Amino acid sequence: MTVPDTRKGLMIVNMGPHHPSMHGVLRLIVTLEGEDVIDCEPILGYLHRGMEKIAENRTIIQYLPYVTRWDYLATMFTEAITVNAPEQLGNVQVPQRASYIRVIMLELSRIASHLLWLGPFMADIGAQTPFFYIFRERELLYDLFEASTGMRMMHNYFRIGGVAADLPHGWIDKCLDFCDYFLTRVAEYEKLITRNPIFLDRVEGVGIIGGEEAINWGLSGPMLRASGIPWDLRKVDHYECYNEFDWEVQWQKEGDSLARYLVRIGEMTESIKIIQQAIEGIPGGPYENLEVRRFDFDGATNSEWNDLEYGFISKKPSPNFELSKQELYMRVEAPKGELGIYMIGDNSVFPWRWKIRPPGFINLQILPQLVKRMKLADIMTILGSIDIIMGEVDR
């Protein structure tokens, strides 16, 4: 019997678009020499829904339900950037209580996003147990979201000038109980995962990105901070009321997959610190700005709060909130990095241009460089450490 010769040429393999490790409908065309990766070409666009064009034909409040479909694991951040941009453009003041509520919701959403990164990331490298652990804590988070917004996901909670509803009775106590409980769970994750020798073998020294390289690629979020750059927009831009709280930016120097894991684990603990301080210091007062005006056609200047010239932004399905003829770039520190909106108004209720800067799309661009000369199994580790959601990448 003749033995066939060993194939020595290159092999091209398709990973995705529905491979379980692809974190969505991402397709990778991988060129292999044995188990060594020679080239990797990401193919995007399978989840493109024209989100930027839709924004040009909707008022801001009409568009809010759409934005929760970008990063559907951290919807509070997409809502925040959608209302922050017109607030800045129209010089709308947000009540202090509403700002505190926003910070609490944003940090809870950050924890939820990092939890649903941690479980699949561990499953990618062969550890199934943490995948079930994170759903235990995530369920408690979603109970808090459901009690305050009415929805477990796709909350549609933020409004121009505030939030849709105040925190219900007893919610703050439940949130504090969750914070105390969750700190013990993070300690459990670190005990089970961080010092596990098998885990360290899979992630240490894999997918290294230097600090200058990260800046040149435009990386942000944990991808940037794990490369030795302590850059966090909550500290840099002082949006909402983050400057009133005592917390530290989490960062590492090594730039590998382990460093990105450590940054996200540390961020969950810091988020709990911010939430506890916000709950302790939350002021009274209104949860929305009821005095966001629209121009009165009669030209009256002395008006009462209940006159027709007042437009109650949160109370109408499609309020007449004009976007002045200006351009503006707004950004927030989302769990995956810098989420930005470049908006141009033209004295209309619809934005003339609505450009989205998704952190996942920018961070994904470095993937081909990271996986070259690595093993095939390392692709899952590196891709998982980047943390992408294809709804945000493809928009």
From Swiss-Prot:
GO cellular component term, pick one: chloroplast thylakoid membrane
InterPro entries: NADH_Q_OxRdtase_suD (IPR001135), NADH_UbQ_OxRdtase_49kDa_CS (IPR014029), NDH1_su_D/H (IPR022885), NiFe-Hase_large (IPR029014)
Enzyme class, first EC level, given as a word: translocase
One function term, GO molecular function aspect: quinone binding
Disulfide bonds: none
Enzyme Commission number(s) from the entry: 7.1.1.-
Family matches, as PROSITE patterns: COMPLEX1_49K
Topology versus the membrane: Peripheral membrane protein
Gene3D superfamilies for this protein: Cytochrome-c3 Hydrogenase, chain B
Keyword Translocase (UniProt): yes
Keywords for the protein's UniProt record, in alphabetical order: Chloroplast, Membrane, NAD, NADP, Plastid, Plastoquinone, Quinone, Thylakoid, Translocase, Transport
Main location: plastid
Biological processes per GO annotation: photosynthesis, light reaction
Localization of this protein: Plastid, Chloroplast thylakoid membrane
Catalytic activity from the UniProt record: a plastoquinone + NADH + (n+1) H(+)(in) = a plastoquinol + NAD(+) + n H(+)(out); a plastoquinone + NADPH + (n+1) H(+)(in) = a plastoquinol + NADP(+) + n H(+)(out)
HAMAP family named among the record's database cross-references: NDH1_NuoD (MF_01358)
UniProt similarity note: Belongs to the complex I 49 kDa subunit family.
Entry function: NDH shuttles electrons from NAD(P)H:plastoquinone, via FMN and iron-sulfur (Fe-S) centers, to quinones in the photosynthetic chain and possibly in a chloroplast respiratory chain. The immediate electron acceptor for the enzyme in this species is believed to be plastoquinone. Couples the redox reaction to proton translocation, and thus conserves the redox energy in a proton gradient.
Assembly and oligomerization: NDH is composed of at least 16 different subunits, 5 of which are encoded in the nucleus.
Protein name: NAD(P)H-quinone oxidoreductase subunit H, chloroplastic
Organism field: Dioscorea elephantipes (Elephant's foot yam)
